[in-house]
Structures are given as C-alpha cells and as structure tokens.
UniProtKB/Swiss-Prot annotation:
Superkingdom of this protein's organism: Bacteria
Keyword flag ATP-binding: no
Keywords assigned by UniProt, alphabetized: Activator, Repressor, Transcription, Transcription regulation, Transposable element
Organism: Escherichia coli
Domain EAL: 1-47
Alphabetical list of PANTHER family matching this protein: CYCLIC DI-GMP PHOSPHODIESTERASE PDED-RELATED, CYCLIC DI-GMP PHOSPHODIESTERASE PDEF
Molecular function as annotated in GO: cyclic-guanylate-specific phosphodiesterase activity
Stated name of the protein: Transposon Tn21 modulator protein
A Pfam family matched in the record: DUF3330
Role noted for this protein: This protein enhances the Tn21 transposition by activating expression of the transposase gene and decreases the resolution of the cointegrated DNA by suppressing expression of the resolvase gene.
PROSITE patterns, A to Z: EAL
C-alpha cells in the first residue's frame, strides 16, 4: 500500500513522515494554493524541469525557488533538490545559507553562485 500525507508544512513534519514510512507528501512546504490560471504554468514548469533536469539550459530556479532554505537542508529537501536540479543547485542553497548566516538576510537562491 502506498501512503500519501497531505498538509506537510514544516521540515520537521516531513522528516517524521519519512521515518514513519510515508511514500508521498504534499503541502505548503512545497507549494501554496494558487489560482487555477497559474496552476497550468506551475505544472508545466515542474514537468519541463523534471524532464530536463540534466540539461544546462534548465534553470534550477524554475523548480526550487519556492523551497524554503530550512527545507532544502533536510535529508528529504536535499534529495529533492539534487534529484530535480542537480548538485550545482544544491550548492546554490549552501551558498545562500552561508550568505543568510553572514548577513541575516535570505537572498533568492538565484542570487548566489554555486560554491566549490
């Protein structure tokens, strides 16, 4: 049986569900409610990103700009970012975290170059 959890809002909740054996999750941690007209574009962005994750022309920011910084550093978040966008994108999150720590400001993931 496949288990789906709805209403996942925090990285802690996501970690608990993963430990409990939950197969799939959805919730505000990944996307907020949106108008129907915006949904088509949202789905197309995800589909294109998933299909083109290894192409250099695909911007990591297409799929992960909505991921909160703290969510990107959970085991699940890291796995998600690396799966859909690759290691370079995860390195952008690391650079973003470093910048946020140094300045106490959370810049957009797109603003920071990959580290390394």
């Amino acid at each position: 049986m496949e288990v789906v959890a709805e209403g996942v809002e925090t990285p802690d909740c996501l970690a608990w569900l993963r430990q409990a054996g939950c197969d799939t999750v959805q919730g505000f941690l990944f996307a907020r409610p949106m108008p129907a007209a915006a949904f088509v574009g949202f789905v197309n962005q995800w589909r294109n990103t998933t299909m083109n994750a290894n192409e250099p022309s695909t911007s990591c920011c297409v799929c992960c700009k909505e991921i909160p910084l703290d969510a990107a550093f959970t085991p699940e978040g890291a796995e998600y970012v690396e799966h859909f966008c690759g290691l370079e994108c995860y390195q952008r999150f690391q650079a973003r975290a470093s910048t946020a720590t140094e300045t106490s400001v959370k810049p957009d993931a797109c603003d920071s170059p990959p580290s390394g």
